């Protein structure tokens, strides 16, 4: 049996694919705590981008808006319409900042994973990646969403809010409680899985066919990243609206 050069190349390609990693964490040691440094660094970058755009778009408000102000106003109107549709005309205004923050943070985080070459930035240990590429970030967003609709329901309906857990029968109390936690957690796992899968697919394709095939996949990744941000924010707003209206 002869081993041809082509077969060696094919085995080499397979080895490169098998070497693609999910990610190496970069930790900060603070006392006895280990903090995910790469998540904090990239999150600060995302927050900095959002604050910069907000500052540039609102520092000199004009009757005839410039391009940046026009863009900021369009985004704000989009978020207000989303919150109004899901929460309701009477209650949505108080929740526009929360829903908008969720949507914009997830959207910019997802796009940063597709557009910013984080892996080219060398660190002593580990590597940088989009904030939503870490399960800790998405679970934290899910817990914030859970806290938000618990607060919304209790603030609007008082102690009667907890009566929904006894419907339609008290036997379902544990399941109803579990459901309120699993709904946002399912969002977090979906978001994490989609962003991680997108980065892994691009990494595998780059190892096989550099520059050619990955480009369409990157555009597809940008589209799905935007859709994931919209889904998370829309369902979070829907859960908040449902908690204030009652159990359906």
From Swiss-Prot:
Give the residue spans that cross the bilayer.
Answer: 37-57, 96-116, 135-155, 200-220, 221-241
- Give the membrane topology, semicolon-separated if more than one: Multi-pass membrane protein
Question: Which cellular compartments is it found in?
Answer: Plastid, Chloroplast thylakoid membrane
Q: Name one Pfam family in it.
A: ATP-synt_A
Give an example GO molecular function: proton-transporting ATP synthase activity, rotational mechanism
Q: Which UniProt keywords apply?
A: ATP synthesis, CF(0), Chloroplast, Hydrogen ion transport, Ion transport, Membrane, Plastid, Thylakoid, Transmembrane, Transmembrane helix, Transport
GO CC terms for this protein? chloroplast thylakoid membrane; plasma membrane; proton-transporting ATP synthase complex
State the source organism's domain of life.
Answer: Eukaryota
Query: Is the keyword Glycosyltransferase assigned to this protein?
Result: no
Which InterPro entries does the record match to this protein? ATP_syn_F0_a_bact/chloroplast (IPR045082), ATP_synth_F0_asu (IPR000568), ATP_synth_F0_asu_AS (IPR023011), F0_ATP_A_sf (IPR035908)
- Keyword field contains Protein biosynthesis: no
Family note: Belongs to the ATPase A chain family.
Classification via HAMAP family:
ATP_synth_a_bact (MF_01393)
Q: What does this protein do?
A: Key component of the proton channel; it plays a direct role in the translocation of protons across the membrane.
Q: Could you give the subunit structure recorded for this chain?
A: F-type ATPases have 2 components, CF(1) - the catalytic core - and CF(0) - the membrane proton channel. CF(1) has five subunits: alpha(3), beta(3), gamma(1), delta(1), epsilon(1). CF(0) has four main subunits: a, b, b' and c.
Instruction: Name it.
Output: ATP synthase subunit a, chloroplastic
Task: Give the gene name.
Answer: atpI
């Amino acid at each position: 049996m002869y081993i041809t050069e082509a077969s060696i190349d094919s085995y080499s390609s397979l080895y490169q694919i098998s070497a693609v990693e999910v990610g190496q964490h970069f930790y900060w040691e603070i006392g006895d705590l280990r903090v995910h440094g790469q998540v904090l660094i990239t999150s600060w970058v995302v927050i900095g981008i959002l604050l910069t755009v907000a500052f540039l778009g609102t520092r000199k408000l004009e009757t005839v808006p410039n391009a940046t102000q026009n863009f900021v106003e369009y985004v704000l109107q989009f978020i207000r319409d989303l919150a109004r549709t899901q929460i309701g005309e009477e209650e949505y205004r108080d929740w526009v900042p929360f829903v908008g923050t969720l949507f914009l943070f997830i959207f910019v985080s997802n796009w940063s994973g597709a557009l910013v070459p984080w892996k080219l930035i060398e660190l002593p240990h580990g590597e940088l990646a989009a904030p939503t590429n870490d399960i800790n970030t998405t679970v934290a967003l899910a817990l914030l969403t859970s806290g938000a609709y618990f607060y919304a329901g209790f603030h609007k309906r008082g102690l009667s809010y907890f009566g929904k857990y006894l419907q339609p029968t008290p036997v379902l109390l544990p399941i109803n409680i579990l459901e309120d936690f699993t709904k946002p957690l399912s969002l977090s796992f979906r978001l994490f899985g989609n962003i991680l899968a997108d980065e892994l697919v691009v990494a595998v394709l780059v190892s096989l066919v550099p520059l050619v095939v990955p480009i369409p996949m990157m555009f597809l990744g940008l589209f799905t990243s935007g859709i994931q941000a919209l889904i998370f924010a829309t369902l979070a707003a829907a859960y908040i609206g449902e908690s204030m209206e009652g159990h359906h």
